[in-house]
Amino acid sequence: MTENEQIFWNRVLELAQSQLKQATFDFFVSDAKLLKVEGNIATILLDDMKKLFWEKNLQPVVLTAGFEVFNTEISIEYVFEETQSTSNSPQISQNKTAELATETLPFVQNDLNPKYSFDNFVIGDENRWAFTASVSVADLPGTTYNPLFIYGGPGLGKTHLLNAIGNSVLASNPKARIKYISAENFINEFVVHIRLQNMDELKKKFRNLDLLLIDDIQSLAKKSLAATQEEFFNTFNALHDNNKQIVLTSDRTPDDLNDLEQRLVTRFKWGLTVNITPPDFETRVAILNNKIQEYNYSFLSETIEYLAGQFDSNVRDLEGALKDISLVANFKKLDVITVEVAAEAIRARKQDSSPKMIVIPIEDIQKQVGKFYGVTVKEIKSTKRTQNIVLARQVGMYLAREMTDNSLPKIGKEFGGRDHSTVLHAYNKIKNMLAQDDSLKIEMETIKNKIK
């Protein structure tokens, strides 16, 4: 590699790392190699499954680096190596070749949703380990974490990761036998095959898979499903013994799956257990910026921040809010989505999810908080750090977040021009204090009653 080529490639990596989350960079970029730059074409060696990501996300990076170093537009030619994920992708083991030559396996509909991929999964601190583990499993199925057990509340991306794993493996090995299924549907299939007295067909279908993706495994945790648990236990063993990958999702940890046989709980913990928690403000903004690409509207940045401040429990609420906005925008024939439009569109959803929300001016909250703690509104908005003023300021921010539908940036602006992260810090601090301090709870209820 020439000196200029090295400078060019270092610049590509530098720009990519500055624009991507670390886990995304590590997986999609770090192992790529520049072979040469000839004329205005850069030849890059990488895994073929990562080409689409480069085409969608890194072309501008290469162009920028090309102009900086060579003062010309650089295009990319991809060369693909035979990757580990290809050579180790799920395949039928050789010791079964003779057996399977005379036995036709039933066709398996994989039921994967093609819209879910690693490329369009938004990474934050709350899901980084789950994402990294999922990428690792897809890259080397059956060898790294088996099973992979992902748990967390609804609407946090567990199903997205399941499908992304399946789609990634399928891209590497189109012949892989993959099945995505909810635990509820597994139960239903078991019941149907019992009634038809055709259990051999069910065993062939599930025990000869290369990759089994089970969603919401907690549905299996019932005493009345002992026979189904037995069948799943045997299916799990058959797959695991043959180094076939199993990925499970749940709304709780394996140990919290009451009424699930202990031998299954033990097996669920054989591999890696990772948690996904609700997205923080920055991740919600990133999710919204990703999702709005599906809509033909222009969202103002303050609108995105407003929406991110309204729904903090899961991604489905954010997706639902965008659908609400789309309906209003279509009806009113709008091109630009302002905060006012968004607030109108999501009002019903906010009332359903947070019936406590009331239209209250932030100034009223500041006045009542100030009276209670013996400070002025001016002091609350100031930069003074005396203990009683800081407490009043944080309580005011907490109540503004709890009792109004204002975004975090808007609340911060009303409290002396502070940014959303300061408001979020104050909110979380008071929330934690309320969980431990009964006297603060009483103070809070007193202030709330005066505000109302």
From Swiss-Prot:
SMART domains, per database record: AAA (SM00382), Bac_DnaA_C (SM00760)
Compartments reported by the entry: Cytoplasm
Domain II, as annotated region: 84-110
Region (Domain III, AAA+ region): 111-329
Intrachain S-S bonds: none
Region feature Domain IV, binds dsDNA, mapped onto this chain: 330-452
GO CC, alphabetical: cytoplasm; plasma membrane
Keywords: ATP-binding, Cytoplasm, DNA replication, DNA-binding, Lipid-binding, Nucleotide-binding
Secreted as UniProt keyword: no
Subunit structure: Oligomerizes as a right-handed, spiral filament on DNA at oriC.
Family classification: Belongs to the DnaA family.
Domain-level remarks: Domain I is involved in oligomerization and binding regulators, domain II is flexibile and of varying length in different bacteria, domain III forms the AAA+ region, while domain IV binds dsDNA.
Protein name: Chromosomal replication initiator protein DnaA
